[in-house]
């Protein structure tokens, strides 16, 4: 199951175990059970602190296995294959169970240990999902730290019947105590906040105690990370707040145009950015979103950022780097069937539609790439483009047109998502040339029509254009003194990762120039 390189790496990790780990498998006669048995046996051979045994009498999913300590039944369970993107989740579960500490903040770990209540989590994932590991790892860690928290990570490809029965049409999909809990990427902090009543209030109280910053960067994607590094290198008090470190690149799989890095993945790049930021004295505030900007009353005064949790942070200068989010179609049925057939991530959710008919909305690079990827999984793909021609690179268009199970419809205006009350069953569109209405029967709709800036919270505070982008000059200055902006949330042309990082650096230098030239009020 594991090649020589993987075994060598895993053996090195297992040397960090400080207490014994037991792998308890519950198997049947399936081929998948045989694979898991082989995998666990190989892992046990790599360390004298790891043992493996079978107990097929347990009333749990088959095949599955528990990662625990001898004499205990506490710990995370994997049902199905833990390979692909989830192999890292498996390795971390082994380390945490074996006594190796998590890198999460001690205050958060203590909060998890003291959560009062019984919670049985189930997370459905796909092996190609790059968003799933964050959720699986967060819940695995919680199950290691708190005996009243159980977690089973379930491979949707192995347990397809459960995917169908529960109408899971997007991953990661999390259930707690048998009820839907959440869909999509969630951080450990966000999960804890949802089950630990009072956590948000405590977080706000703690943030309110923080001293004013010289520069506070709102948004922790590439632009925000670059701004934080450049600011901290100037020796000024720097804060960096955001909902999730990495921002939109966490939803990007392959990145091949970040100069000097021939190929990487969004999560890897986000991780590298975090490591770089952590090299400097930056106060990183995770899982916090801004709800309002209150500009300083006088030049040189303190600007205020109100957070969604109710906290107020103050700073002499602000850099807004809140990025953008997926654009919606804004048609009837889209909201109702979001995660029930309407999705925005072909890499995460594509495997859930294996053998089914789907549509991709949008003929730009992202839409055409999605259609190409999906064509190798699903029965049939219909790509609908609003304009008379696709905007994707010609090499991508040529590849798409070569695929036999893909139809391309131009001048198509999507008008409605059709459903049966629980899931998507079709799509309605209007031919923009003839005006005729057409219906397509399908199970999934992948929306790839661009991005919208995350700037609604700035209403009335800074000038924005009709698209909602923050209007900036060549130095990333807004119309408000001491407030700067960078990246995809601004009017800067071409929304690219490398451009965002450059703009973040520029905004930081401009903010520093403002600080040294402006007398404190």
From Swiss-Prot:
Keywords, comma-separated and alphabetical: Acetylation, Disulfide bond, FAD, Flavoprotein, NAD, NADP, Oxidoreductase, Redox-active center
Disulphide-bridged cysteine pairs: 345-348
Residues where NAD(+) binds: 357-371
Cofactor: FAD
Spans through the membrane: none
Gene Ontology molecular function: any one: NAD binding
Entry keyword NADP: yes
Pfam families: Pyr_redox_2 (PF07992), Thioredoxin_3 (PF13192)
InterPro entries referenced in this protein's UniProt entry, alphabetically: AhpF_NTD_C (IPR044141), AhpF_NTD_N (IPR044142), Alkyl_hydroperoxide_Rdtase_suF (IPR012081), FAD/NAD-bd_sf (IPR036188), FAD/NAD-binding_dom (IPR023753), Ferredoxin-NADP_redctase_2 (IPR050097), Pyr_nucl-diS_OxRdtase_2_AS (IPR008255), Thioredoxin-like_fold (IPR012336)
Xref: CDD domains: AhpF_NTD_C (cd03026), AhpF_NTD_N (cd02974)
Residues holding FAD: 214-229, 478-488
Record EC number: 1.8.1.-
GO cellular component: alkyl hydroperoxide reductase complex; cytosol
One of the protein's GO biological processes: response to oxidative stress
Gene3D superfamilies assigned to the protein according to its UniProt record, in alphabetical order: 3.40.30.80, FAD/NAD(P)-binding domain (3.50.50.60)
Note accompanying the cofactor annotation: Binds 1 FAD per subunit.
Enzyme class: oxidoreductase
Sites bearing N6-acetyllysine, chain numbering: 53, 354
Function as written in the Swiss-Prot or TrEMBL entry: Serves to protect the cell against DNA damage by alkyl hydroperoxides. It can use either NADH or NADPH as electron donor for direct reduction of redox dyes or of alkyl hydroperoxides when combined with the AhpC protein.
Similarity annotation: Belongs to the class-II pyridine nucleotide-disulfide oxidoreductase family.
Note: The active site is a redox-active disulfide bond.
Subunit-level organization: Homodimer.
Protein name, UniProt field: Alkyl hydroperoxide reductase subunit F
